[in-house]
């Protein structure tokens, strides 16, 4: 059985991580591209989790 509350918490965690990497990119221009790539991946993970939650609710 899928633990929806755990997935929701993971979704929020991925979004927080993405924001953290984006903030780091602003502070470290030399790593900007890499950090934005990581943030993008975190947002993709969050989107996948969101789809799992939505699919489970239907």
Which positions does each model-derived feature cover?
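Non-heme di-metal
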Residues: 1-58
């Amino acid at each position: 059985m899928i633990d929806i509350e755990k997935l929701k918490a993971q979704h929020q965690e991925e979004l927080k991580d993405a924001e953290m990497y984006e903030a780091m990119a602003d502070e470290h221009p030399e790593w900007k591209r890499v950090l934005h790539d990581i943030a993008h991946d975190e947002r993709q993970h969050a989107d996948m989790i969101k789809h799992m939650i939505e699919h489970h609710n239907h």
